[in-house]
Amino acid sequence: MPKPADHRNHAAVSTSVLSALFLGAGAALLSACSSPQHASTVPGTTPSIWTGSPAPSGLSGHDEESPGAQSLTSTLTAPDGTKVATAKFEFANGYATVTIATTGVGKLTPGFHGLHIHQVGKCEPNSVAPTGGAPGNFLSAGGHYHVPGHTGTPASGDLASLQVRGDGSAMLVTTTDAFTMDDLLSGAKTAIIIHAGADNFANIPPERYVQVNGTPGPDETTLTTGDAGKRVACGVIGSG
């Protein structure tokens, strides 16, 4: 007598066939809906991919130092020799980028501090100015630096003020085209000095203020110093 057909086996085969058909149809539909895109590193093509290579120049999100840049450094110390800050001067594209950073906390009082380049590369505590007079800390560095042929206010060596945080630390990045690297290294060289107080940049409106002798506007001391007070840290530029 013949065996009855195994309906369960037929059902399993039918299910497998149908599943394969549906999967094949789904793949065909997905293929039809997708554009034949291929990975490309050519700008403007899609889809974009990460290749593991560095970003092209100009696309990294920040400026890089120019290949021809030249630099000078300085370490600023207090009258007792304690290291207070470092300074770096980078020269490129016709101007200098000046970076000042404190080396620790608590060495400067919070607030604004005058910051200038001075005309002589000497940072001697309790010294006399080149023009003579009573001694004082770092007076050997002379007055604010002027490039040859420049006079008046602001001086060539006047920089943006350093703002010190509550913990006594600070950092400043500023730019200037008032001098070149050769200017800072010529002759007696130059020094960078942090002062005890803020610099008013001789901003004394003559229509509002008069001197004790009745002359309107800033006096000679204000014009030459900015009334920034004592010299609290000094470094010879180019000394490292």
From Swiss-Prot:
It holds the Pfam family Sod_Cu. InterPro entries: SOD-like_Cu/Zn_dom_sf (IPR036423), SOD_Cu/Zn_/chaperone (IPR024134), SOD_Cu/Zn_BS (IPR018152), SOD_Cu_Zn_dom (IPR001424). Inhibited by the copper chelator diethyl dithiocarbamate. It is found in: Cell membrane. Binds 1 copper ion per subunit. One of its GO terms (biological process) is response to hydroperoxide. PROSITE patterns: PROKAR_LIPOPROTEIN, SOD_CU_ZN_2. Transmembrane segments: none annotated. Residues 36-77 are annotated as: Disordered. GO terms for cellular component: extracellular region; peptidoglycan-based cell wall; plasma membrane. Residues 36-51, 68-77 have a biased composition (Polar residues). Its cofactor is Cu cation. Residues 1-32 form the signal peptide. It catalyses: 2 superoxide + 2 H(+) = H2O2 + O2. A lipid is attached at C33 (N-palmitoyl cysteine). GO terms for molecular function: superoxide dismutase activity. Keywords: Antioxidant, Cell membrane, Copper, Disulfide bond, Lipoprotein, Membrane, Metal-binding, Oxidoreductase, Palmitate, Signal, Zinc. SUPFAM superfamilies: Cu,Zn superoxide dismutase-like. A lipid is attached at C33 (S-diacylglycerol cysteine). Its main location: membrane. Cu cation binds at H116, H118, H144, H195. The keyword Lipoprotein applies. Homodimer. Destroys radicals which are normally produced within the cells and which are toxic to biological systems. May play a role in favoring mycobacterial survival in phagocytes. Does not bind zinc ions. Has normal enzyme activity in the absence of zinc ions. This is Superoxide dismutase [Cu-Zn]. It comes from Mycobacterium tuberculosis (strain ATCC 25618 / H37Rv). The gene is sodC.
